[in-house]
């Protein structure tokens, strides 16, 4: 699947944001292994329903490090890899792993029903939360994150793939977007950078 659709544009935007952050960097600021996007003007608060049908806002998770990832349950590679890395990172954090909340936003609300989404996401970690909206709501939230989602028709209406941007967004406990983690960075990068956010909060 072409899950890196549009990543060249996003990479440019993130590089610009990182450069601006670097110009104002405190010499004592944490040295992250992923991209520091502190001060970025995207990825603001949103509301979607969780897999139990309860409305959730990003701001509901202040006090924890919130980790936002867009994907879908039929994803063959990027999504299970990223969720596995996050589950491993949380284990590496030990007791501090309880202060991390992973939010998986489905890019395929047509097939990812609440039941399907819950079964999939909690298989990686029972504390992970899956979020879904209508196709229109999903498109709106994706746009707010500069995430590109494209449905590719298959052999029938239920057999298709979804291209989606593959990075992960990490918020500090105060609710500020701080990091963009590119696909394939690995569990150790997640664990290292999340630990720094928890320590500095």
Place the predicted regions along the sequence by residue.
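Structural microenvironment flanking redox-active thiols in thiol-disulfide oxidoreductases
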Residues: 81-141
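Hydrophobic beta-strand anchors of alpha/beta hydrolase catalytic cores
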Residues: 67-68, 102, 168
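Thiol/disulfide oxidoreductase modules built on the thioredoxin-like
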Residues: 137-193
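Buried hydrophobic packing residues in well-ordered domains
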Residues: 53, 72-75, 86, 117, ...
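Short active-site neighborhood of thiol/selenol oxidoreductases, capturing the structured segment around
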Residues: 59-82, 86
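N-terminal targeting signals for export/organelle localization
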Residues: 1-49, 197-201
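Sec/Tat-exported extracytoplasmic proteins
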Residues: 65, 72, 90-97, 121-124, ...
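A short beta-strand-turn-helix
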Residues: 46-66, 90
């Amino acid at each position: 699947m072409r899950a890196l659709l549009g990543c060249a544009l996003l990479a440019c935007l993130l590089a610009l944001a990182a450069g601006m952050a670097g110009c104002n960097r405190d010499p004592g600021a944490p040295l992250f292994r992923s991209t520091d996007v502190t001060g970025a003007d995207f990825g603001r608060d949103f509301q979607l329903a969780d897999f139990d049908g309860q409305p959730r806002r990003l701001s509901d998770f202040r006090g924890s490090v919130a980790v936002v990832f867009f994907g879908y349950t039929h994803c063959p590679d990027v999504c299970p890899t990223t969720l596995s890395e996050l589950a491993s990172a949380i284990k590496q954090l030990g007791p501090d792993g309880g202060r991390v909340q992973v939010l998986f936003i489905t890019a395929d609300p047509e097939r990812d029903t609440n039941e399907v989404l819950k079964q999939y996401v909690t298989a990686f970690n029972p504390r992970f939360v899956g979020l879904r909206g209508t196709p229109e709501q999903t498109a709106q939230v994706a746009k707010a994150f500069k995430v590109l989602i494209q449905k590719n028709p298959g052999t029938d209406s239920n057999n298709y793939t979804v291209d989606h941007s593959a990075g992960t967004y990490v918020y500090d406990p105060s609710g500020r977007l701080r990091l963009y983690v590119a696909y394939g960075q690995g569990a150790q990068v997640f664990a290292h950078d999340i630990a720094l956010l928890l320590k500095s909060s």
